[in-house]
Amino acid sequence: MATVYDVPGDLLVERVAQRLKEIPEIKPPEWAPFVKTGRHKERLPEQEDWWYYRVASILRRVYIDGPVGIERLRTYYGGRKNRGHAPERFYKAGGSIIRKALQQLEAAGFIEKVPGKGRVVTPKGRSFLDKIATELKKELEEIIPELKKY
């Protein structure tokens, strides 16, 4: 059985985002169409369903890095801000988006809080991601036969 580590992250996040759309606990908040994802961004996200991709990415990140807290995720999703003539500077991503996404993943049962450490993936969340990774790996092996040795 393949794990999250065995498949490309971008393909996995895309597939997980499609599956998360079917889960009733995961839905964008009413303010989602109007927010930037952090201070370092100039514009809103262009994709209509960007929320599901961010939630899928956060779930993958908790799987890989867990236990992980909001501050570490804010740093991961942050970036450089263009400040005109002043030198560029790193800014963290917005915390509300990450916090709401984590709360929705907790409500769905995919992650849980560990007091004093952060959030970790539950067995249900690990199974969810590993099943999708296994499906994706089988599809990739048909396209790229060299992947069968892994």
UniProtKB/Swiss-Prot annotation:
GO molecular function, one term: structural constituent of ribosome
Recorded GO CC terms: cytosolic small ribosomal subunit
InterPro entries in alphabetical order: Ribosomal_eS19, Ribosomal_eS19_archaeal, Ribosomal_eS19_CS, WH-like_DNA-bd_sf, WH_DNA-bd_sf
UniProt entry tagged with the keyword Coiled coil: no
Keywords carried by this UniProt record: Ribonucleoprotein, Ribosomal protein
Entries under SMART domains matching the protein: Ribosomal_S19e
Top-level taxon: Archaea
Pfam families hit by this protein: Ribosomal_S19e (PF01090)
PROSITE patterns the record matches: RIBOSOMAL_S19E
SUPFAM superfamilies: Winged helix' DNA-binding domain
Keyword Iron on entry: no
GO biological process, one term: ribosomal small subunit assembly
Secretion signal span: none
Family under the similarity heading: Belongs to the eukaryotic ribosomal protein eS19 family.
Cited function: May be involved in maturation of the 30S ribosomal subunit.
Subunit structure: Part of the 30S ribosomal subunit.
Name of the protein in question: Small ribosomal subunit protein eS19
Organism for this UniProt entry: Pyrococcus horikoshii (strain ATCC 700860 / DSM 12428 / JCM 9974 / NBRC 100139 / OT-3)
Gene that encodes the chain: rps19e
